């Protein structure tokens, strides 16, 4: 019963990242109440050059997200967690560079048109210094084009910092096309290569299949696995997936018929769950390797058919032994660790959401933003902020796993390229497999 209770509690909390109603986050000041911090003492750079969005008392940043939940995403939790962390920073630490951070957040309804429109408002009307934490590759594509070349003349010198985007498409690392865009989450090529390394080290004689979404996300995994697998002949099936049930089943059975004994899934959670259910019905049980974008708890809910304890346990039993990766502390497994206890205090004290995977992610990203601003105090301009971000080396957020670091440079805009391989257990916990793997 202890395992059942732990699994059920863990899953209910983790499911908040996929099924809870979105927590709306209004734009405007990150401080819902007056600051209790003492007036900050002068700091180096207080009187130095500064760009749009910077005054003697504040630094304005912008972010767009599906704040209303109209696209049925849980991502407003990220913005809410960032607001809470900045409020803590302003209240307890006096802000950064002697100024308070003011995050202006706009609802983009998780559409490219909405994201571009609200970003233009934040830049052209609200005059924010930089944008942070953009979500979704298709949603962010037109936004990135605008931020890297605002007037569309082909000259990127007048760009706006596009900091720590929350999409792992490898294309953001093209510093010629996107010189102002900085990644945050591990790029999908990195994750694919870490999974391929597991195949090389532990399943070296197994035939390999790949089922990937037919977009930039899936294409990165196809490329990454195919490039990193030592014995290319072992890749017997590589397919981009049509998610309709009939086509999905046919593609799964075609993968089975090639003799694939290990299958890499680069699919969103609902489609991945359908693959697991179809495979079980067909008696097909390869070793599964799953993109980190899939929450094990979300998969367990989808596979088991609900959130009741027995349904979740059924889902985790089907996932048992599957391989995935992680790079942040777990809101459940690491709940007693000092960084998670401090994270919980911040969320509870400063109006953040209930602690979950997305709040951990949000604070981790916010810490990287703050470190970037600290390094730009002598020149809080858009160019100064970009150069400060590019200077980050061996930066470890308090909520990153041990051994995971953020490393950037003028020619390297891939932030996190270290992942911890894990094996999903039947009680929903994650077993670390060796040390974190770094991929450059």
Language-model features: where?
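Hydrophobic alpha-helical segments within soluble ligand-binding/sensing domains
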Residues: 115, 183-207, 246-249, 272, ...
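Extracellular/periplasmic periplasmic-binding protein-like sensory domains
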Residues: 280-363, 432, 436-438
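Extracytoplasmic "Venus flytrap"
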Residues: 43-58, 62-83, 108-112, 135-136, ...
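Beta-alpha junction/loop-to-helix N-cap segments that form part of ligand/metal-binding clefts
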Residues: 29-32, 46-47, 73-80, 92-172, ...
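Segments of small-molecule ligand-sensing domains
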Residues: 349-359, 370-429
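Short, low-complexity, disordered segments immediately C-terminal to signal peptides
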Residues: 25-44
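Extracytoplasmic ligand/sensor domains, especially the bilobed periplasmic-binding protein
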Residues: 128-239, 287-321
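Sec-dependent bacterial lipoprotein signal peptides
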Residues: 1-22
């Amino acid at each position: 019963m202890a395992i059942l209770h732990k699994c059920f509690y863990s899953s209910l909390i983790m499911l908040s990242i996929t099924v809870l109603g979105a927590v709306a986050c209004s734009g405007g000041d990150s401080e819902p109440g007056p600051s209790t911090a003492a007036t900050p003492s002068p700091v180096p750079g207080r009187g130095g050059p500064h760009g749009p969005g910077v005054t003697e008392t504040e630094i304005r940043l912008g972010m767009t997200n599906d704040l209303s939940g109209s696209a049925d995403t849980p991502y407003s939790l990220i913005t809410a967690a960032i607001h809470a962390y900045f409020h803590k920073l302003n209240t307890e630490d006096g802000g950064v560079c002697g100024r308070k951070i003011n995050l202006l957040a706009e609802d983009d309804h998780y559409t490219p048109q909405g994201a571009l429109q609200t970003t233009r408002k934040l830049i052209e009307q609200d005059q924010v210094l930089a944008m942070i934490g953009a979500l979704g590759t298709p949603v962010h594509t037109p936004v990135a084009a605008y931020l890297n070349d605002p007037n569309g003349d082909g000259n990127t010198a007048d760009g706006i910092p596009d900091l720590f985007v929350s999409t792992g498409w490898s294309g953001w690392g093209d510093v010629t096309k996107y010189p102002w865009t900085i990644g945050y989450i591990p790029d999908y090529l990195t994750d694919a290569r870490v999974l391929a390394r597991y195949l090389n080290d532990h399943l070296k004689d197994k035939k390999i299949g790949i089922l990937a979404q037919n977009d930039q996300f899936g294409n990165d995994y196809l490329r990454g696995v195919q490039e990193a697998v030592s014995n290319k002949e072992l890749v017997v099936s590589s397919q981009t997936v049509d998610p309709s049930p009939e086509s999905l089943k046919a593609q799964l059975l075609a993968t089975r018929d090639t003799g694939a004994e290990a299958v890499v899934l680069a699919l969103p959670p609902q489609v991945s769950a359908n693959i697991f259910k179809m495979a079980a019905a067909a008696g097909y049980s390869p070793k599964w390797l799953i993109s980190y974008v899939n929450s094990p708890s979300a998969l367990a809910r989808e596979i088991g058919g609900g959130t009741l304890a027995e349904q979740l346990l059924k889902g985790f039993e089907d996932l048992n032994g599957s391989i995935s990766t992680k790079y942040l502390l777990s809101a459940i497994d690491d709940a007693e660790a000092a960084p998670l206890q401090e994270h919980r205090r911040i969320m509870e004290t400063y109006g953040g959401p209930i602690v979950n995977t997305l709040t951990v992610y949000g604070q981790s990203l916010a810490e990287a933003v703050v470190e970037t601003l600290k390094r730009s105090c002598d020149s809080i301009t858009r160019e100064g902020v970009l150069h400060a971000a590019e200077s980050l080396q061996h930066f470890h957020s308090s909520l990153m796993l041990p051994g995971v670091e953020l490393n950037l440079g003028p020619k390297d805009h891939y932030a996190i390229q270290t992942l911890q391989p894990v094996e999903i257990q039947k009680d929903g916990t994650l077993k670390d497999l060796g040390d974190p793997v770094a991929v450059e």
